[in-house]
């Protein structure tokens, strides 16, 4: 355009299928986005004008339904909420500042406020949990904020220290007491605290107890990541890395099914998980293959000194995690 920068409008339609042994989940979404850069190209803005998602469950296994959703002794609110059909109508704004050795990303999104207004005017019906419904489907209401900072300190052509911090907070309110599964934070994995496998860490000092539902119990409303990574060129296309990662996720409300998971100002720093490791990267320029191996150093899921500090008492089978990924972690 005239400014020497190009704005773009994106119309997207997506269909997501998730088939697990316990359930089938479908997400249909459509969105209108508008992106534009500043004249120098350093800042890219993104406006989510409108984004609609419809989440529905065509099938849930009878035993799973009986054991977790209908059982009076195990009325898991987080599970139950995430196994009901849901409508998400959101809008958002984000920006990315990229100065080469310094990258900042920030975004905010809100959902359900417009529908909440309509529900007051048109008196939408309520379901058994007191949630207002549109076409017999409850709608989600939340606000979400994400901030990410990466700094590269280049000592020479082949040696770089990368610093990275990430903070995400989402608050369900109004029509929602629980964040939709798609919007919940998780920790661990190739781009987080690498001493844990994906969705294996947190929230807080909560420890996963049930393989069938840990993937949803080990999610939260808040995420903190702090990473330090030294990168060096080895030979040919191979680069090496040594890193330390710290972080966790937390819930903002207290949920009985996630004991020890709530964020509290006076205890959260004791629940920060730490891991350390080495990485090997095969760098082809246009894409990077990455192998990272990490050991747990501080594990908030255990109170006992020996298990809480695996850096002093490492157990290979319990404390090691291996990741294969495409692209850099940050």
Regions found by a protein language model. Give the residues of each.
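Strand-connecting loop/turn motifs
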Residues: 6, 101, 156-160, 235-237, ...
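Outer-membrane beta-barrel and related beta-rich outer-membrane complex signature
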Residues: 23-25, 40-46, 57-59, 116-122, ...
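Outer-membrane beta-barrel "beta-signal"
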Residues: 32, 282-285, 316-330
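Extracytoplasmic gating/loop element in the C-terminal half of outer-membrane beta-barrel translocons
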Residues: 160-243, 250-257
